Each structure stands twice: as structure tokens, then as C-alpha cells.
Amino acid sequence: MDSKAIAERIKKLQAQQEHVRIGGKGTPRRKKKVIHKTAAADDKKLQSNLKKLSVTNIPGIEEVNMIKDDGTVIHFNNPKVQTSVPANTFSVTGSADNKQITEMLPGILNQLGPESLTHLKKLANNVTKLGPDGKGEDEDVPELVGDFDAASKNETKADEQ
């Protein structure tokens, strides 16, 4: 056998090695069946479990905001909200957007708790320290020390005389 035939034989054996043997020694090799789960199947299972909890719909909710510790917000616009009071369970379904807390201002201020308000104050302090252009303060610009108005007034008086 030449080297090309050996290389082809090795590739063929490696391809066969990937297959899963089902059954005994004499049975042919078969590919393992992979079942792909879809979001619709998960949604059906979730809805059936919610029916077991006897959930009730809560109408009239326009938006739901879930605030994370890192300052991001999961925002649901016109969600379907269901609750089960005996099970202490709430279900929020709908399309969700991940947004920064600064994008949601000022409408989200009345929804913030004390922890989120302190986080927001820290963010505001960081922004003011950086300045409007996002860079630190310029160190090249000297600070004003004296009163320049008095010198200009003296010049105008000298010009009048």
C-alpha cells in the first residue's frame, strides 16, 4: 500500500470512529439521533406548568423593568404578566431588550430602589469626573490666580487721562 491509500484508510477509520455503536458486536454502526429542542417546545412546557399552578393574567401592564446589579436593565415593553399568589410566582413573557440604566432615565427613577439609586449616583460621579469629552481634566491649562478685572480697569483709567 502506498502512503495515499494509507492516509485515505486512516481518514475513513476516523470517520467511522465518530459513529456510536448501538447494540452488540455484530450490529451495524448507526449515528446517534440528536433531538433539537426549539423555543416553541420550551414555551409549551412552560405554559403547561403555569396552568398547573393556576395562574391568572394581570391586565394593563405597559412595561416591566428588571434591574441587574451591574447597572443593566432587562426591559419588557407590553409584556404578558401572569401570577399565582399561592405559589408566590410571577411570569413575564414577551420580547426583552437589554439596556443600560442611563438609557432609561428619567422615566425609571420612580422604579429604582435604594441600591440602584446609590449605583446611579456612583455612575453620575464618574461621568462628572471624566468631563464632557470622556477624558480626564486637562492638566496643561493653568488655574487662574489673580483678579484680572482690576488690571483692566486701571488701564482704562490711564487711557482716559
Curated annotation (Swiss-Prot):
Chief location of this protein within or outside the cell: nucleus
Subcellular location: Nucleus; Cytoplasm; Mitochondrion
Alphabetical UniProt keywords: Cytoplasm, Mitochondrion, Nucleus, Transcription, Transcription regulation
The name this protein goes by in its record: Transcription factor BTF3 homolog
Organism: Caenorhabditis elegans
Entry annotated with the keyword Cell membrane: no
Compositionally biased region (Basic residues): 27-36
Self-association state and partner proteins as the record states: May be part of the nascent polypeptide-associated complex (NAC), which is a heterodimer of icd-2 and icd-1 (via NAC-A/B domains).
Superkingdom of origin organism: Eukaryota
Cross-referenced SMART domains: NAC (SM01407)
One GO CC annotation: cytosol
Function: May be a general transcription factor that can form a stable complex with RNA polymerase II. May prevent inappropriate targeting of non-secretory polypeptides to the endoplasmic reticulum (ER). In response to heat stress, plays a role in modulating the unfolded protein response by negatively regulating the accumulation of proteins such as the chaperone protein hsp-4 in the endoplasmic reticulum. Required to suppress apoptosis in neuronal and intestinal cells to promote development.
PROSITE patterns: NAC_AB (PS51151)
Record keyword Transcription present: yes
Residues covered by region (Disordered): 16-41, 128-161
Domain NAC-A/B: 40-105
Family listed: Belongs to the NAC-beta family.
Matches recorded under InterPro entries: BTF3, NAC_A/B_dom_sf, Nas_poly-pep-assoc_cplx_dom
An example Gene Ontology biological process: embryo development ending in birth or egg hatching
